[in-house]
Amino acid sequence: MSRDNHPYYEVRYILAGVILTACVYLAFVSAVALEQSVSRFGYVADPDGTRRFLRELAEPNFEQAGADAIKKAKGVDTFLYRAVYKAHAARYGKPFVVGSQGIGDCISWGFGHGCYFAACINWQTGKSSEAPLMPATESIYGGSRVEGRGRPEGSGGWSDGSYGGAAARWLSEVGGIVYREPVGGHDLTTYSADRAKQWGYWGNGGEGDKGKLDAIAKKHPCSRVALVTDFNSAAAAIESGYPVAVCSGVGFESTRDADGFAKRGVHPWGHCMCFVSSRHADGEGKRDGLLCLNSWGPKWIGGPKWPSDQPDGSFWVDRRTVDAMLAGEDSFAVSSESFVYRDLNHHDWLGVAP
């Protein structure tokens, strides 16, 4: 009997093959897990960059720009997503469902949600005659990595990520909003992770655009942004209809408690999301909190919701954790006009669901 045909060596060959196959599989699974982990986040803080941007603003902080909204705030529970439900159904004929980022472009989703919610509220309150289109997140992402930082086309780099100050600068000072529609030679009707990656390198509009899409974006600026640094300011902003794009390193668990809150997690997140509603301990919500809308689709988190129509994919954050998130000083309230106090109709589209 030859050595190769000996049962002992046949078993060794089989075991070696099994081990090799297992190693290849584990390497593949690890690579996929790493890719998914990277694509879930994308906030890369640049404190110096944000400070430089804030120096460009006459009223950089919400305490200044939103003094009227803070002074007149009543501390009422406010649910801005209800305006979005109505506006989205009017524009698209279907319910609003939170999207899912495909690369580390969370900055564009956090600020995109903020701009969309603000526009829906303007429509609901009669400031706009037509229900708004959704912003194209790829444009915000590219603009935040290139034009928003004063860089030339093709200098964004291939790594993922951006920061709040760059997105705020792009939307309010050097660019603006491009909508989900065919525009400027691009069909932006649906989100494309590949387009986001390309535009993150080349800038808004991609390779060879040479500023054409920038000119279109400038027609629709998010006129006012202001730095928000604490719970009270954020709650006052939301009460007047101004969402807050929140950039932080605070992570969360993936199950909500009985009141719809998610507990702060052990592992940090470099992530941007959006605060879109508020509740107060002396109101029907019975706890101070802000509702945080994520960009991982509707099913990443489970557990009870409050109110019952709370958006899937969102969770409430308690006051202490909100303050920790905003302490990074890279989170911005957004508005298409100003930050004046608005006495919104809380008995209709902002009332508590039955």
Indicate where each model-derived feature is located:
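Intrinsically disordered/low-complexity terminal segments and short unstructured peptides
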Residues: 20, 49, 77, 136, ...
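N-terminal Sec-pathway targeting helices
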Residues: 6-17
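Structured alpha-helical subdomains that flank or immediately precede key functional sites
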Residues: 15-16, 27-132, 156-180, 329, ...
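Acidic helix-start/capping segments at beta-turn-to-alpha-helix junctions
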Residues: 128-150
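Predominantly the structural core of cysteine protease catalytic domains
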Residues: 34-40, 108, 112-116, 146-293, ...
